[in-house]
Swiss-Prot record:
The keyword Ribosomal protein applies. One of its GO terms (cellular component) is cytosolic small ribosomal subunit. It comes from Methanococcus maripaludis (strain C5 / ATCC BAA-1333). The lineage of its organism: Archaea, Methanobacteriati, Methanobacteriota, Methanomada group, Methanococci. Keywords: Ribonucleoprotein, Ribosomal protein. GO terms for molecular function: structural constituent of ribosome. InterPro entries: NA-bd_OB-fold (IPR012340), Ribosomal_eS28 (IPR000289), Ribosomal_eS28_CS (IPR028626). This is Small ribosomal subunit protein eS28.
Length: 76
């Protein structure tokens, strides 16, 4: 049943830069992506993405309003 779920409002975005990793075990990538469709076409956002990602990948965003906070400096 979950495989049949389709997001009508999803917008494609292309990964143009990988800023780093976050999360307790580094499983989340922070990326900059360029919106390819919808009302925000051409806008560049910073988003957190779970799972493997590389430059040029297309990701589907349910909404394009939110941006991720910048990664902070790591304490030693």
């Amino acid at each position: 049943m979950a495989d049949d779920m389709v997001y009508q409002e999803a917008v494609a975005a292309e990964v143009i830069q990988i800023n780093g990793r976050t999360g307790v075990t580094g499983e989340i990538f922070q990326v900059r992506c360029k919106i390819l469709g919808g009302k925000d076409t051409g806008r560049i956002l910073t988003r957190n993405v779970k799972g493997p990602v590389k430059l040029g990948d297309l990701i589907m965003l349910r909404e394009t309003e939110r941006e991720a906070k910048q990664l902070g400096k790591r304490r030693k």
